[in-house]
Regions:
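A generic secondary-structure signal for well-formed alpha-helical elements
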Residues: 5-9, 31-34, 145
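Short acidic-hydrophobic sequence patches enriched in Asp/Glu that either
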Residues: 15, 19, 43, 133
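Glycine- and aromatic-rich loop/turn segments at beta-sheet edges
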Residues: 34-43
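Catalytic and substrate-binding regions of extracellular carbohydrate-active enzymes
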Residues: 49-229
Length: 229
């Protein structure tokens, strides 16, 4: 779009130029070592090789100074890369591709994906697409095979909004750590509060010293904060 307007020697509105640059920066932020995007919230196996060539020609500087964009935390140390979903679910009107995987993650080592999340089911059966959105399909903790987010099954509603979500949750208490020992963060979500009266906390860190990944899941009682053993 930007190049087409430029070649046509048309006036580029400042707001449009800003929107294009912001979107390109997001693509740069999310591009994985294998030239794809993380498999969160509608992400599927899509090569960005040709798109990356365009970005290089566009001479856009990759900005990795931010730790988080769009609810996805990013960390890198040497040959390790971590993507961590710490965001809240979108508004119902924009949730037709949402995957119910709060605190799910993907991990790369030496350019290879070691831990993957479930990609969104494109061009498959309706049932398989729904399965690809359930919590049990994601790289996160599940309790009693329960999907944290419920999906709308009403055909009329789905015709208007797509297969949108019916309920929501909150992610909170993000704590980022970035020192010589560990690079990563911890976060909580209350998706299991209504049915199980508990809070899920996940800590996940890259260890630069040993090229390793360290993580731990906590389940706390909502009423008193005591860990469930």
């Amino acid at each position: 779009c930007f190049e087409s307007i430029k070649d046509a020697q048309e006036y580029m509105p400042e707001f449009l130029d800003d929107i294009i640059k912001r979107n390109l920066n997001c693509i740069k932020f999310f591009k994985t070592p294998d030239n794809q995007i993380p498999f969160f919230n509608g992400g599927s196996q899509t090569s960005l090789v040709q798109f990356e060539k365009y970005l290089e020609n566009f001479k856009l500087i990759k900005n990795r100074k931010k730790n988080c964009i769009g609810g996805i935390f990013y960390a890198k140390s040497k040959q390790q890369v971590l993507y961590f979903d710490i965001g809240n679910p979108p508004d119902k009107n924009f949730s037709n591709n949402y995957q119910s995987g709060p605190l799910s993650f993907e991990y790369f080592l030496d350019g290879m994906k070691i831990i993957t999340n479930c990609g969104f089911g494109n061009n498959i059966s309706t049932k398989a697409e729904l399965i690809s959105r359930l919590t049990a399909s994601q790289s996160t903790l599940t309790i009693n095979d329960t999907s944290i987010t419920k999906f709308e099954r009403n055909k009329l509603v789905n015709r208007i909004f797509g297969n949108s979500i019916k309920n929501t949750f909150k992610a909170f208490d993000l704590e980022i750590k970035n020192d010589k020992s560990f690079v990563g963060c911890s976060s909580l979500h209350n998706g299991y509060e209504k049915n199980f009266n508990c809070i899920h906390k996940r800590e996940i860190y890259i260890d630069p010293g040993v090229n390793g990944l360290i993580g731990i899941d906590h389940i706390f009682k909502k009423s008193d904060g005591i860990p469930i053993r």
